[in-house]
UniProtKB/Swiss-Prot annotation:
PANTHER family: THYMIDINE KINASE, THYMIDINE KINASE, CYTOSOLIC. This is Thymidine kinase. The active site is at E86 (proton acceptor). ATP binds at G8, P9, M10, Y11, S12, G13, K14, T15.
């Protein structure tokens, strides 16, 4: 059917938008599932709960945490709508093949993830999905310094570690000007 991408910096509402879209389909009695990478510590798998950075929770009957997608493709046959949160953590080839295969088999895939790391380098998982996607939504946050629209994520410290799970203690959204002026925070 189709692939939709929701992307942007941290705190731009990607998970909130994913939850909103999935909730709309659930209200229409569509069979939905949400997938999150097993590295994501905002999820409460035992309670089937997905949590955004604001603490908003959605309880979902069908919630799966995994780090590999393609070898589990058969378990998604029963779903019409498949949401994938924190897509930047998944292997880019695995994610691309998974999404393309399911979309070609009549599933709607909604993928949410960061547009880039704190060095403004794009995540391969997003880049590889762009050519095979029907819809791309780029969200913005609010700059922590000047309160203008923010399109980048800046890391406060530990800048030698590219993938590090953290919240506002470690990452902040910033605009281009404030990124360039303040990206020396240690």
């Amino acid at each position: 059917m189709s692939i939709e991408i929701i992307t942007g910096p941290m705190y731009s509402g990607k998970t909130t938008e994913l939850i909103r879209r999935i909730t709309r389909y659930k209200l229409c009695k569509k069979n939905c599932v949400i997938i999150s990478h097993s590295i994501d510590n905002r999820c409460e798998e035992d309670d089937n709960i997905l949590i955004n950075h604001d603490g908003f929770k959605i309880s979902h009957d069908d919630f799966i945490k995994t780090n590999i997608l393609i070898n589990k493709i058969k378990i998604f046959d029963k779903y019409e709508i498949i949401g994938i949160d924190e897509c930047q953590f998944f292997d880019s080839n695995d994610l691309m093949i998974f999404c393309d295969t399911l979309a070609n088999n009549g599933k709607k895939i909604i993928v949410a993830g960061l547009n880039s790391d704190f060095n403004k380098n794009p995540f391969k998982s997003i880049i590889k999905l762009i050519p095979i996607s029907e819809k791309i939504t780029k969200l913005q946050s609010i700059c922590n310094f000047c309160y203008n629209d923010a399109t980048f994520t800046m890391k406060k410290f530990n800048k030698d570690i590219i993938i590090e799970i953290g919240g506002s203690d470690l990452y902040i959204p910033v605009c281009r000007i404030c990124y360039n002026e303040n990206n020396t925070i240690n």
